[in-house]
Amino acid sequence: MAQVRIAVRLQSLGLPLRQSLAMAASMGASAIQLEAGKDVRLSELSATGIRQLRKMIADFDLRIASIRFQTRHGYDHADGLSRRIDATKDVMRLAFQLGSPLVINQIGNVPEQTDHPRFESMAAVISDLGRHGTRVGTFLAAETGTESGPALARLLEADENAFVAAALNPGKLIVNRFGISDAISALGSRIQIVIASDGVLDLAAGRGIDVPLGQGTADYPNILAELENRQFKGHLVVGDEQPGPESQARARDGVEYLRNL
């Protein structure tokens, strides 16, 4: 089974930065995920601020597994696209300075057909961001879930000279009725990080719903075994998308669940 390296999504803890770091460390995590613009305003960090933040994180024996940069729209949305691309590049550059190997974003709804006009425009953006990642040293990771794994893989493979990673989100795949194993098979070694989430299909409601990690249909022992076959060495990120009354307990339970696999 692949080695379980756990990161905590700091935003889910709903605490100031230093307290969040202390709690993540107390849970037994080895890394964190920061939210650009929420946990820390990257654009306002000076060189001194970057050094201080890196030291603060290291003081808790943690590292940054990824930075989440959630744009209002994906790269499939033409309005304001140039600004989103430039902002993504800026975050990737600052992420490298902070020691983060990945910047995660939901890139938009990828068409299943490669001859779709939207596929072609998204492929051009992904190529641009992939080449930028090679230059700056931190890569964009496209989160799974809004399309099938094979559809996302076709987009990421459109330019063999530009690398964009994948952030596997099993819960979102379940909720949107896509196969997890299909996604792992299609994306392979591009999977650099896992958003440790879970879900079930609510047949009565005709839709999928999010549930706490370990309480849904995501088969994490099998997921980790499949990832091990593809030399996965990344982190599994635990934590709710938005902090709530139960988020701290859910994060702690999630860490314990993964450590007990």
Where are these regions (language model features)?
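Histidine-acidic metal/acid-base catalytic patches
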Residues: 1-7, 14-30, 58, 99, ...
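N-terminal pre-domain/capping segments
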Residues: 1-92, 96, 100, 255, ...
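Short, contiguous strand/loop micro-motifs
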Residues: 6-8, 39-41, 77-79, 115-117, ...
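Small/polar loops that bind or transfer phosphate-bearing groups
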Residues: 9, 140-144, 215
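Active-site-proximal loop/turn and secondary-structure-junction residues that shape catalytic pockets
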Residues: 12-14, 36-38, 70-73, 107-111, ...
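Active-site acidic/histidine proton-transfer and metal-coordination neighborhood
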Residues: 18-19, 56-59, 75-166, 175, ...
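Short beta-strand segments at enzyme active-site cores
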Residues: 33-34, 64-69, 100-107, 140-144, ...
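A short acidic, helix-capping loop that chelates divalent metal ions and anchors anionic groups
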Residues: 38-43, 72-78, 111-115, 175-177, ...
